[in-house]
Amino acid sequence: MARNLVCGRWQLLRLLRPQRSYHSVAVSLRPLAAELLAARRGNGRPPCALLAVFTPRCISTSATLFAEAQVQAPPVIPATSIPAAVPEVASGGAADVVQCATEPSFTELGLGSYTPVGLIQNLLEYIHVDLGLPWWGAIATCTVLARCLVFPLIVKGQREAAKIHNHMPEMQKFSARIREAKLAGDQAEFYKATIEMTRYQKKHDIKLLRPLILPLTQAPVFISFFIALREMANLPVPSLQTGGLWWFQDLTVSDPIYVLPLVVTATMWCVLELGAETGVQSNDLQFMRNIIRVMPLVVLPVTIHFPSAVFMYWLSSNVFSLCQVACLRIPAVRTVLKIPQRVVHDPDKLPPREGFLKSFKKGWKNAEIAQQLREREQRMQKHLDLAARGPLRQTFTHNPLLQHDPSHPPKAPNSNNSSIKANAKKPWQDTLG
C-alpha cells in the first residue's frame, strides 16, 4: 500500500513538473483535472485525498524580477509645465464676472426682504448679478420699470389736467368774483359765487385737486428707492464703490464736484414747469407757478450731499419724465390714450399775468383779509350765543359811568335830527366793533 501511495505521488509530481528548463508562464493545453483523473484510474486504487501546495517556484522569475524592480525604482514624476502668471486685474466682462462671483449676496449683507425697500434691493441685485449690468445701469433700468408701472396713473392725470385747462377762463371768472367778495366783505356774493363755481365743476366733472392727487402715488415709490439706495450706500455694498460712471465712479458717496445735484435740480425744474407729472402747466394756475419755481432751489441745499446712487435714480426718473411729456404732446398718442386736446384760449379773455413779487403780495393780502373775515364771524357767533343764553343787555346813548353836571343833563337823542342819524353808527358795528 505504501508503494502504491508513493507511485501515485510520483505521478502527481511528474505532472506538476515544468516541461522546460527555464520558467515560463505557458501551461499545458490538457486540463490538469483530466490528467489527475487518468492517473488515478491507471493505478486502480481507491482515491486518496491529496493537498497540492503551490510553491513560489510556480511564479515566473521574470515576473518576480519585474515586481522587485518596480519596488526598488524611485517613482517617476512627470514633467509639468509652469502655469502662466494670471494678471491681477481682468479686463472687460471678465472683471465683472470675477467680481460678481466673489462679492457677497444681499442676504449675507443683511439687505433684501419682502418689504417695498427689500423688494427694490432684490430687483437691483438681480439686474446687476444675473443680467450683468453695472450698478448705474441697474439703477436706471429699475427706475424705468417702476415708472412704466405708474404710467397709467400719469395718463389719467393728463386727462384731468387737459379738462381743467379747457375750462380755465370760466374758472378764473368765478375765482375773481369770490376774491372781490372777500375784499368787500360781502358774504352773500361770496357764497353765491362759491355755489355757482361748485355747480359748474360738478356739471363738467372738474376736480382741481385730482391731477395733483394721482401723481402723489409716486411718493411711496420715490421714498422706497431713496431708502433702498441709501442703505446700500451706507453699508456699503463693495461693488457699489466701483459701479459708477465717468467722474462719479463711487456711488456710495456724494458727487465730489456737485455736478449731479445741479443737473438733477435743473431737470426737476423743467419737469415741474412743463407739468410732466401732473399735466397742469405752471401758467395755468398762478399760485402753482410760484411754488413750482421756488421748490427746486429750496430742495437743493438739503439734497446736495446725498449719495450718487440716489442722484442716479433721481436723474433717470427726471429724464424719463421729460421724454414722457414730449411723447404725450404728440396728437396721435393723445388720441390713442383718450387725452383731450388742449384748447388755445384768447389771451384777451384771460386775466393778465403778474410778476412773482406782485402776486406774492396779493396772495398775502388775500390771506389777511380771509383771516379778518374769520375773526369777524367768530365774534358775531359769540354775541349770538350770549344773546341766546341770557337776557338782552341794556344799551345807552351815552356812557353811564361818566359823571355829568346836574345843570347839564345828557341830551336825549332827537329822532328828527338828521345830523344825528347821519353820524349814528350801525347797531351791529357798535356791538361787534
UniProtKB/Swiss-Prot annotation:
Topology Mitochondrial intermembrane: residue spans? 1-108, 156-207, 277-293
Q: Which residues are recorded with the post-translational modification Phosphoserine? A: S359
- Kindly give the InterPro entries that the UniProt entry links to this protein: YidC/ALB3/OXA1/COX18 (IPR001708), YidC/Oxa/ALB_C (IPR028055)
Signal peptide (from-to): none
| Cell compartment(s), UniProt | Mitochondrion inner membrane
The annotated region (Disordered) lies at 397-433
Listed transmembrane segments: 109-129, 135-155, 208-228, 256-276, 294-314
Please provide, in alphabetical order, the Gene Ontology terms of the cellular component aspect for this entry.
mitochondrial inner membrane; mitochondrial membrane; mitochondrion; protein-containing complex
Please name one Pfam family that this protein belongs to: 60KD_IMP
From the UniProt record, which GO molecular function terms apply? membrane insertase activity; mitochondrial ribosome binding; protein homodimerization activity
Could you list which ranges are Mitochondrial matrix topological domains? 130-134, 229-255, 315-433
Membrane topology annotation: Multi-pass membrane protein
- Has the keyword Phosphoprotein been applied to this entry? yes
The protein's matches in CDD domains, at most eight in alphabetical order, are given as: 5TM_Oxa1-like
Q: Where is the composition biased (Low complexity)?
A: 413-426
Q: Which residues carry this modification: Phosphothreonine?
A: T395, T397
On subunit structure and binding partners, the annotation says: Monomer; predominantly monomeric at low salt concentrations. Homooligomer; predominantly homooligomeric at high salt concentrations. Associates with the mitochondrial ribosome. Associates preferentially as a dimer with the large ribosomal subunit 39S of the mitochondrial ribosome. Interacts with OXA1L; promoting cotranslational quality control in mitochondria.
Q: What is this protein called?
A: Mitochondrial inner membrane protein OXA1L
